[in-house]
Amino acid sequence: SLLLYWHNHPSLSYLFSGMFVGPTSQAPRVDEARNDQLYELEIAIEQIYKNRELYGQSMPPWLVDRTLRNILIDVTGNTHRSEFSIDKMYSPDSSTGRLGLLELRAFEMPPHARMSIVQQLLLRALVARFWRQPYTRPAIRWGTRLHDRFMLPAFVRADFEDVMEDLRQAGHAFDGTWFAPHFEFRFPIVGEVDVLGMRLTLRNALEPWH
């Protein structure tokens, strides 16, 4: 659910990230790594659901690792450089790979503790929401729209408000203003000017690394 939801809401990939995003960053999205990666992810998720039906609650945890390990990678095949890193979740290769840890590597440490707390609240709410009702919507083929739109603050803000509304409908009373510091930090104002009753605001945008 988290993989698909993050994919369909690019604001979650970019709002909390560092300045280095894109295919050669430390935490590329699935659709930034290889062109066929999303298709392979859909097949992998289908296999996970089939195994869940087959094994039920007794499904071996290493099946998730073996199914996703070669998909959650960057362009070089590095399993650590991925938006969702499962290196330390449940790898059967070594004991250090079976720590039950899921790394969200696109999350940069924010400059204030309260910004970190509200991020944690967001993650807890999304996990709770998908625990009750798994996310099964089809993956969106963003194509070039991903970097054409979601490097800009207006599109990130609009998409993130959809996430807030989704959580509110699920019973979590989220307020988008809680994340105003994150927007100001990620897309700082360069300058503003008022002309004939019109206001022009110029902000920094993101730039993908290729």
Q: What kind of feature is each model-predicted range?
A:
Residues S1-H210:
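C-terminal accessory/tail domains of diverse enzymes
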